[in-house]
Structure formats: C-alpha cells, structure tokens
C-alpha cells in the first residue's frame, strides 16, 4: 500500500506557558487535497494540545480510513503505540500505579483510532524544516492566538 492510498495527518500542539493558553493544529492531506484545522484552550498543557490535535483530525474524517499520523511528540507517538496497552490493562494506571495523566484525552484518542481501518504512527523531528510539520506548528500557534 502506498501513502497515496492513505490520509496523511501532520499534527502539533503549542502552549504559551505550561500550563497556560494552548493551541493545536492539524494539516490533513489526501490525493493532493489539503485541509487545515486548529483550535485552542485557555488553561491547558502542551501535551494535552498534542493529543487534541490528533483527536480532532481523526474525528474530522467522515468515514473509516487508512491513516498515517505524523507527530513531533514522542509522548503521543509512544503513548498511543506502546504505553496505552499497559494503561488499559491496569485500569488507566501507570506501572507505578499512579493515574495516567490526560487519561480523558487518551481514551478519546483510542476511540477515534479504533474508528479507522488502520492508523500508522510516525514521529518526525520538530523544528527541523519538515514542510508539513512546520505548517502544523503554525496552525497550533494560530490556535493559541484564538483564545
């Protein structure tokens, strides 16, 4: 399967102060077409905005799709592809038996992921000149400015 058969989603989160006002952004690409999404919250964290960007992008897809998500957040990439299995098995507790931070958003992200046929998670280095990741960053900053 080529990437042309998949929806590509580039996501980012931003926060002015952590916690503080924050924003999320997502650039969605499919067969030459693009859609930009962004939003913000007054009192939030960077990690919450990173997760929210992916939730909102996956939710914007009207039907089950094959998706590649690109994120510069190792927290998101590892959380959804590695850590979430243990969290769920332990009733949303960490290995240290502490409540999982942002469990509400992880649960939403898990539900959105499960709506789709296949979701692949790829980490990209942030602020390294990757065109589409830079655009997601700009959208996240627009989200901060919107609150």
Swiss-Prot record:
Places the protein is found: Cytoplasm
Entry-linked Pfam families: RNase_H
Chief location category: cytoplasm
UniProt: Mg(2+) 1 binding residues: 12, 50, 72
PROSITE patterns: RNASE_H_1
Highest taxon listed in the record's lineage: Bacteria
One of the record's GO cellular component terms: cytoplasm
Signal peptide (residue range): none
Gene3D superfamilies (UniProt xref): Ribonuclease H-like superfamily/Ribonuclease H
Claim: Cytoplasm is one of the keywords in the record: yes
Record EC number: 3.1.26.4
Record-listed Mg(2+) 2 binding positions: 12, 137
InterPro entries assigned: RNase_H, RNaseH-like_sf, RNaseH_domain, RNaseH_sf, RNaseHI
Domain RNase H type-1 span(s) in chain numbering: 3-145
Listed GO MF terms: magnesium ion binding; nucleic acid binding; RNA-DNA hybrid ribonuclease activity
GO biological process entries: DNA replication, removal of RNA primer
Textual note on the cofactor: Binds 1 Mg(2+) ion per subunit. May bind a second metal ion at a regulatory site, or after substrate binding.
Catalysed reactions listed for this entry: Endonucleolytic cleavage to 5'-phosphomonoester
Subunit: Monomer.
Function recorded in the entry: Endonuclease that specifically degrades the RNA of RNA-DNA hybrids.
Full protein name: Ribonuclease H
Native organism: Chromobacterium violaceum (strain ATCC 12472 / DSM 30191 / JCM 1249 / CCUG 213 / NBRC 12614 / NCIMB 9131 / NCTC 9757 / MK)
């Amino acid at each position: 399967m080529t990437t042309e058969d998949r929806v590509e989603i580039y996501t980012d989160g931003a926060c002015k102060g952590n916690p503080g006002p924050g924003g999320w952004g997502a650039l969605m690409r499919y067969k030459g077409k693009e859609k930009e999404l962004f939003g913000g919250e007054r009192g939030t964290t960077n990690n919450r905005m990173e997760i929210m960007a992916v939730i909102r992008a996956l939710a914007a897809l009207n039907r089950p799709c094959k998706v590649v998500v690109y994120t510069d957040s190792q927290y998101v990439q590892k959380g959804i592809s590695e850590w979430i299995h243990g969290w769920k098995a332990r009733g949303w507790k960490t290995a240290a038996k502490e409540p999982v931070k942002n469990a509400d958003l992880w649960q939403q992200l898990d539900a959105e992921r499960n709506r789709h046929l296949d979701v692949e998670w790829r980490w990209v280095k942030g602020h390294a000149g990757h065109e589409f990741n830079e655009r997601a960053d700009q959208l996240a900053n627009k989200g901060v400015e919107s609150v």
